[in-house]
Regions:
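Zinc-dependent deaminase
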Residues: 1-22, 92-151
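Small-residue (primarily alanine) positions within well-ordered alpha-helices
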Residues: 15, 19-22, 32, 58, ...
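Short beta-strand scaffold segments in enzyme catalytic cores
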Residues: 30-38
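A short, polar/charged loop-to-alpha-helix boundary motif
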Residues: 47-61
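Immediate flanking context of iron-sulfur cluster ligation sites
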Residues: 70-82
Length: 151
């Protein structure tokens, strides 16, 4: 296993911990980590249910927790689920050059769109990420349908 893939898997494990924290609180299990190399800048998870905030997706929470930055040009966004249109927009707005996705089985997002804008996409197809979303979708189908799952 290459050093890059090893780091990607380590960071995804941190993002999955965030997703599990959201699931344990009755929320949507999407976790995210914003990193520069092996340095974690910030982490977050979906808090839409917990805070009644429709834009508190995992990637957005990680960006909020990162605070202001002059540039995101050296960062990677690790997210347990393929980004929705809103989170895709944030990735493009802040010019995050690399996104590592835990899984795109339970929600495909539009990874080709990100690629077409020059974003490097790595899809890990992590079974832990898949299991967390499948558990959530089975336990809370109505909550999922209120969010991106309703499409």
């Amino acid at each position: 296993m290459s050093d890059v893939l090893r780091l990607d898997r380590e960071m995804m494990a941190l993002a999955l911990q965030q997703a599990r924290a959201s699931l344990d609180a009755g929320g949507v299990p999407v976790g995210a980590v914003l990193a520069s190399g092996d340095e974690v800048i910030a982490a977050g998870h979906n808090e839409r249910v917990q805070h009644g905030d429709p834009v508190a997706h995992g990637e957005i929470s990680a960006l909020r927790n990162a605070g202001r930055r002059a540039s995101y040009g050296d960062t990677t966004m690790y997210t347990t689920l393929s980004p929705c249109q809103m989170c895709t927009g944030a990735i493009l707005l802040f010019q995050i050059p690399r996104v590592v996705v835990g899984e795109a089985r339970t929600f495909a997002g539009d990874l080709d769109f990100l690629r077409s804008k020059g974003v490097e996409i790595v899809l890990l197809d992590d079974l832990g990420c898949v299991a967390a979303m499948e558990e959530f979708q089975a336990r809370y189908p109505q909550v999922w349908s209120e969010d991106i799952g309703g499409r």
